[in-house]
Regions:
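Extracytosolic ligand-binding ectodomains
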Residues: 1-199
Length: 199
């Protein structure tokens, strides 16, 4: 549904709910069917074009690490289609996975993240997560905006602002009440995140 809000419609969607409960053959069969795999072992020069130009995998790290190598095995890896990931993919296990090299990630730009993490750690003796940063920013935003004592409703004030820079990154409130964020585009290359050669 969220892709539709931006005028994008997926040509195919594969749902794999609980792959830990799935038999391996069933798991492989579902991915093979999704990739529209054609066996070219007898004639390697007949590899057809990939079934899709872009792949988005939504799931936790373990899920991604189970699905990506199988997609590559069935000729639908980042060498043949654009793989798009999110900031949750910025983990050593994912960056080191051979079948995810050339994947493009979007990461929020968070210039004050280390400052927030130090303050949070000193106060609570534990690591901060994304939810803590967003909650802090939301609270600060509402307090600051409501202190303006404007006759305009608070929701309208939030929508009309140019944007905010908080610990969770730069964002603007949409009319739907969602946040629109500024992201940086990076690529996994040689087990590291680098700026892609083409932006």
């Amino acid at each position: 549904q969220q892709l539709g809000e931006y005028g994008l419609l997926p040509s195919s969607v594969l749902y794999l709910d609980d792959i830990s409960m799935m038999e391996q053959q069933q798991f492989l069969s579902k991915i093979k069917k999704f990739t529209q795999y054609v066996d070219t072992t007898k004639d390697p020069l007949t590899l057809p074009p990939p079934a899709f130009d872009t792949i988005i995998i939504a799931g936790n790290t373990d899920f991604i690490l189970q699905v990506a190598p199988i997609l590559s095995y069935y000729d639908l890896g980042p060498d043949r289609a654009l793989f798009i990931g999110i900031d949750k993919w910025n983990r050593p296990k994912v960056l080191n996975e051979p079948s995810l090299q050339k994947t493009v990630l979007t990461l929020p730009i968070r210039p004050a993240e280390s400052k927030f993490n130090k303050i949070w750690q000193a106060e609570f003796r534990m690591d901060a997560n994304d939810l803590a940063k967003m909650a802090f920013d939301a609270t600060a935003l509402v307090i600051t905006t409501s202190a303006l004592e404007s006759p305009v409703p608070l929701s309208t004030q939030l929508e009309n602002q140019a944007g905010f820079i908080g610990f969770s990154g730069q964002f603007k409130m949409s009319k739907a009440g969602l946040t629109e964020r500024v992201f940086e585009i990076l690529e996994i290359s040689d087990n590291m995140l680098v700026k892609p050669s083409i932006q």
